[in-house]
Structure formats: C-alpha cells, structure tokens
C-alpha cells in the first residue's frame, strides 16, 4: 500500500471513482494523469482532477468560492518531507497552495458523498468503509478565493476529437463517478486558507487557530476509526455550519 494513504484508508482500496467503463473514458483519465495537485481524502477514490477537456466551457457564475479539503496531518507531513519538524498552519497552506499545483479539487455544498459505492473486497462488500483510520489525525481545511472567479461547466453536446488545456485562474465543476467537485486551476494565485478544523473522538469538529492548538491536536489521534456513515454525518454538519459554495448541476 502507498505510504501516501497509510493513515487514510484500510489496506485494500475499495472504491474507484476513476475506473474505466468505456474505452473513450481512457483519454479523460490520461487528460489529468500528469497534473500536479495536492493529495487529500479525494485521493481515496482515485479522483484525478483533469487539466484538459474535449468540451467547450460555458461560463455559469462569477463569484467568490468557499470549498473544503479533508486530509490527515500525516499525509501533509509525508508529502512535505518534514521528518521530525513540527507541522504548522503556514506549512499546510504552502502545501495546498504551492505554485507547482496546477489544480485543486474542492468539496462544495452540493458534493454528495452518498454516491460512493464500495467496491467488493473478495466476497464481502464493505458498506461502511473506513475513511480515516484509528491513530490518524484528520483535518478539514476551508479555502476561499481572494476575489471573484469565473466558474465554468463543460458543454457535453460540444465534444471535440482533441483535448485542449482548461487554463488558469478559473474553476470548473466536474463529476467523478457521481461525485461533484469544484476544480480550481492555478489555486496559488486565487485561493487562501481560511480555517482548519480537527476531529474530536466524538466525531465532532474543533477549530485549530494556532500552531500550538495544531500541535496539541496531533498528539491526540483518533481512538476509533471514522467510517463512511459517520463521515457523511460530519460532512452534512460542515455544510450546515460553513457556507460552502453551491453550484447546482444537472445530471
């Protein structure tokens, strides 16, 4: 198993949002396969945000964006190669908003994680999969734009035979196996970290406003794993208390 996901999921990957059902879909996976983006909980579902599209982009909104990213402190420490150095709020922001990141996928208000369908593992289907393992320190990061940004959708009736770059300084609503996410392109130029929350052992959220609070939180990892059902409840709580961007889409 990849060390990248060591503290995120169980030993077996049980869901593939990037699985290919038709040959034509292969090009869509390739279109984003080499993109540079910060890993998060969405990586559990093999979501690879695309940097190219074969469809025309239609402008649907121009507004400020607020979106969420779930990950673990281990994931960030490992990717930054911090070793024994302490993880700070500044390091978390620099990880997600590194200028080398071409795209950042955000969970928004109309991201419906109930669309997750667990993959069969042997003869068993784990209907309540582990999202964050016991002993991990998951965090919720809230990002917002510094100013209004253009939000696009793909016109599925305008398919081309060639893929073209989506471009910088814009957002694109995208769907991966039924899960809507908002991809923000060149996030370092338009986004900022607004808040960080930790998870209590009662499956509630607590705001981490200082590096000291972040350090104390990391010393008290989860005593029990957070499974899908509990995570869905947490996500709904987040949506009710944090005004995430809502972009209604038609299936």
UniProtKB/Swiss-Prot annotation:
Give the propeptide segment as residue ranges: 1-32
Membrane among keywords = no
Q: Which GO terms describe its molecular function?
A: structural molecule activity
Q: Where in the cell is it found?
A: Virion; Host cytoplasm
Q: What does the UniProt function comment say about this protein?
A: Major core structural protein.
UniProt lists the family membership as follows:
Belongs to the orthopoxvirus OPG098 family.
User: What is the protein name for this chain?
Assistant: Core protein VP8
The organism encoding this protein is Variola virus (isolate Human/India/Ind3/1967)
